[in-house]
Amino acid sequence: MPKYRSATTTHGRNMAGARALWRATGMTDADFGKPIIAVVNSFTQFVPGHVHLRDLGKLVAEQIEAAGGVAKEFNTIAVDDGIAMGHGGMLYSLPSRELIADSVEYMVNAHCADAMVCISNCDKITPGMLMASLRLNIPVIFVSGGPMEAGKTKLSDRIIKLDLVDAMIQGADPKVSDSQSDQVERSACPTCGSCSGMFTANSMNCLTEALGLSQPGNGSLLATHADRKQLFLNAGKRIVELTKRYYEQNDESALPRNIASKAAFENAMTLDIAMGGSTNTVLHLLAAAQEAEIDFTMSDIDKLSRKVPQLCKVAPSTQKYHMEDVHRAGGVIGILGELDRAGLLNRDVKNVLGLTLPQTLEQYDVMLTQDDAVKNMFRAGPAGIRTTQAFSQDCRWDSLDDDRANGCIRSLEHAYSKDGGLAVLYGNFAENGCIVKTAGVDDSILKFTGPAKVYESQDDAVEAILGGKVVAGDVVVIRYEGPKGGPGMQEMLYPTSFLKSMGLGKACALITDGRFSGGTSGLSIGHVSPEAASGGSIGLIEDGDLIAIDIPNRGIQLQVSDAELAARREAQEARGDKAWTPKNRERQVSFALRAYASLATSADKGAVRDKSKLGG
């Protein structure tokens, strides 16, 4: 029977000092012996996805205390990728994931907490907390802040839905008037919550459902809706039950590594492909799997991508649907239900509620459930009122979207595409693979060949795109922006958005060893591995080289002879200490970022730290 970790600091005469300090936090004699549960919050006023979380930790803590536990709350950092986008701030985004994971480990292990409730929401916060949870392997439940309502505005006598990406594109489009750009900007992000499309934050919060570490509704129920409060109340109660099951009944099924098993990771990736999630999810799932010591690699993702259809299409791949529409159609469980009926899921998995996949679907799939309360929860909709307050409205759709032929979520027979929303490509400058969000690629450019325009920084590429130096048919290559080369593997949302602004969204490709925002669509290929800074062949591409992209056949090829590539590699190596670095780039890199770069691996490894360099 495992002993409560917290007993290390609460029992024994030699821990009198520790108990004295615990008493100073409000604990009493009656609390020593109860499980100490960390409420890992991420409230910050910098991020709309987190601005409403200030009081939600207290909400969870009250339920923990009522159920017989002791709750202790702390906060992690949280970077807003949208605000950090397009300048040096983006260098810090991905490295913040490792800082978050480490800070959770530091706090939980330093104070010997027994379990956690992770209150996350945005891009790197959920992955960082997920990595920490699987590293620590103590009972955990995730409950996110929830999605933002979609923006809405009237243009040309028509009400249209908007999000952050629309504001970016229109702001850079010279054909759009100042007044229209201002109107879109003011309407794009109307409420608290994670940005309203199937961007990275919402993708990851959906995947925690598929991994079994969060409750049904976590990924899609709006931040503003009163129904979301119940997820926080339930999490506080349930974590005490899971904690006691493990420590008092020796039930290891309550541990995250047993819930988020290899089968669960495969289900999560299957969901990701079917819903056309952000390419960043590949990076984060690979990283989380390593923390869980699960053999889950790019090869597994490639195999799944070849057999899983696209059953859901959401912004940025279409402006018709946002997360509020996914929820109305049944949310994550609705998509999992269709995948299960198609025979594409591992059924022998459980979630934090203790339910198997079939039991979860029977209870929560809107196509199966007889529970009116569940159906009512999935009718929770937007209010259209600007707010930064959680649970501030209780509007409902008149009906569910259960149209699996023409609705937001489709059945296998009516799939948007027989190929899923993500694909892994391989070729002579992406030997370890690269990722494309096929959900956002127009059918006309699934095969594309063009001359390379090579840039050694995102800034130079943006200047060229906006300056008219990139023309239809070009393949824009942005290198030395990987985890090590950037450092920090910047997101390329501005270059891809500006290609659209210049009318080139369906006429050009963009390839990078960096990554993309979940808001990116178009022929945008990222995570090229190995990255240029690690000696990857993307560092050998020259202006004018032809690059052939073949998504249906999962290929990407630099049309240069092996002999020529060998000669270029020899010339690169001859640069000595300057080999595999940008030739003409001045970038101030802080010590903190240099420390990150010194251990960073390429994207095919999840951009995690290279343990071999630390003797691990």
UniProtKB/Swiss-Prot annotation:
Protein name: Dihydroxy-acid dehydratase
BP-aspect Gene Ontology terms: isoleucine biosynthetic process; L-valine biosynthetic process
Subunit comment: Homodimer.
Keywords: 2Fe-2S, Amino-acid biosynthesis, Branched-chain amino acid biosynthesis, Iron, Iron-sulfur, Lyase, Magnesium, Metal-binding
Cofactor(s) demanded: [2Fe-2S] cluster; Mg(2+)
UniProt binding sites for Mg(2+): D81, D123, K124, E491
Active site annotation, chain numbering: S517
Entry function: Functions in the biosynthesis of branched-chain amino acids. Catalyzes the dehydration of (2R,3R)-2,3-dihydroxy-3-methylpentanoate (2,3-dihydroxy-3-methylvalerate) into 2-oxo-3-methylpentanoate (2-oxo-3-methylvalerate) and of (2R)-2,3-dihydroxy-3-methylbutanoate (2,3-dihydroxyisovalerate) into 2-oxo-3-methylbutanoate (2-oxoisovalerate), the penultimate precursor to L-isoleucine and L-valine, respectively.
Organism of this sequence: Escherichia coli O9:H4 (strain HS)
Gene Ontology MF annotations: 2 iron, 2 sulfur cluster binding; dihydroxy-acid dehydratase activity; magnesium ion binding
Gene3D superfamilies: IlvD/EDD C-terminal domain-like (3.50.30.80)
